[in-house]
UniProtKB/Swiss-Prot annotation:
It is found in: Cytoplasm. Keywords: 4Fe-4S, Cytoplasm, Disulfide bond, Iron, Iron-sulfur, Metal-binding, Methyltransferase, rRNA processing, S-adenosyl-L-methionine, Transferase, tRNA processing. Its cofactor is [4Fe-4S] cluster. It comes from the Bacteria. The active site is at 107 (proton acceptor), 351 (s-methylcysteine intermediate). Binds 1 [4Fe-4S] cluster. The cluster is coordinated with 3 cysteines and an exchangeable S-adenosyl-L-methionine. This is Probable dual-specificity RNA methyltransferase RlmN. The gene is rlmN. Its EC number is 2.1.1.192.
Length: 364
């Protein structure tokens, strides 16, 4: 049994830490300061220390009065994540397995592109959606992450990039968990990382993906955010989608498409449909024709995903020539489509794989 598993089984490290200051929006921090007799402008100074200088100790915030630094230290923590495993791929992709205060672990991935560095963040410890092709759902949902724990992932990766004077240029919320199942923390996270005084990641450089929790799609559309939005679709018909994604029983495909149309009409923004290709399951030309019919007339983009092999699942990769044929079939119908570039194929880069491997080690 590893130290992580031992802590969870014995109760060690189970004491709740102080609330993470990373969980506070700038307005919430201003409110806290005013309530404690301080000027609201101090919030901007604190944000600069947290997200500009990325300090991890309130004592280092030297332009704040000592009394305020002490008050902050007694009221909040600055979340730091312990790196358990760090895997680096030949293509530069880096996968981190971070340990949380209670011993649970989460994954965060840094992906290198010719246009910058993208971070894929996790929103939950585990997942309850139950997609039959995904390693994230193995073991079920353990708990939601606090907004500060999601923010801390980006900060941690940015600190690693500081060593080479690089920066995080985009964020994808596509790691372990269903973001809309942890909606309030997600929205707070988005507001913090997008804020010009926070991590200052432009809204159009942030993408949120959902498996299709329909009420939250309507709510997200009404938020008025310019965040990129993606649907994990993976099947063009109700029957096939239900086999791949049990959530389709609760939120069936026709209703999902109604919600997508509402989102497009409300925001004027394009929706991306993620479509993982599984050999012999959803990758035939008839599936491409069905998908084109489903998406006809929509302001959308299809992202075809060559799937990573997951040992605990039985799906196999679609051959490259078949992926290209699928792409051509969609283009023939005027569908905007790309094939996702593979990242970290030589490491445990599929969502949840590294954490699943760690869980196996813990049970030995």
């Amino acid at each position: 049994m590893t130290n992580t598993a031992a802590r969870r089984s014995t109760g060690e490290a189970q004491l709740l830490p102080l609330p993470s200051i990373y969980s506070l929006t700038l307005d919430e921090l201003k409110e806290w300061l005013v309530a404690h007799g301080e000027k609201p402008f101090r919030a901007t100074q604190i944000y600069e220390w947290l997200y500009g200088k990325r300090v991890t100790d309130f004592a280092e915030m030297t332009n704040l009065p000592k009394r305020l630094r002490e008050q902050l230290a007694s009221a909040f923590s600055i979340t730091t994540l312990k790196t358990i495993v760090k895997q680096t791929s030949k293509d530069g992709t880096i996968k981190f397995l971070f340990e949380l205060h209670d011993g649970y672990s989460i994954e965060t991935v840094l992906m290198r592109h010719n246009y910058g560095n993208s971070v894929c963040v996790t929103t939950q410890v585990g997942c309850r959606i139950g997609c039959t092709f995904c390693a994230s759902t193995l073991g079920g949902l353990k708990r939601h992450l606090e907004a500060g724990e999601i923010v801390a992932q980006v900060v941690q990766v940015q600190k690693a990039l500081d060593e080479t004077e690089e920066r995080v240029s985009s964020i994808v919320v596509m790691g372990i968990g269903e973001p809309f199942d942890n909606y309030d923390a997600l929205i707070k996270f988005l507001r913090i990382v997008n804020h010009s005084k926070g991590l200052n990641i432009g809204a159009r450089h942030i993408t949120v993906s959902t498996s299709g929790i329909i009420p939250k799609i309507y709510q997200f559309a009404d938020e008025g955010m310019q965040i990129n939005f993606a649907i994990s679709l993976h099947a063009p018909t109700t029957e096939l989608r239900t086999k791949l994604m049990p959530i389709n029983k609760a939120y069936p495909l026709p209703k999902l498409m109604e919600a997508v149309r509402y989102y497009i009409e409300k925001t004027g923004r394009r929706v991306t449909f993620e479509y993982g290709l599984f050999g012999g399951v959803n990758d035939q030309l008839e599936h491409a024709e069905q998908l084109a019919e489903l998406l006809k007339g929509l302001k959308c983009h299809v992202n075809l995903i060559p799937v990573n092999y997951v040992p605990e699942r039985n799906y196999v990769r679609t051959p490259r020539n078949q992926i290209f044929a699928f792409e051509r079939a969609l283009k023939k119908h005027g569908i905007n489509v790309t094939i996702r570039r593979e990242h970290g194929h030589d490491i445990d880069a599929a969502c949840g794989q590294l954490r699943a491997k760690e869980r196996k080690e813990e049970t030995r």
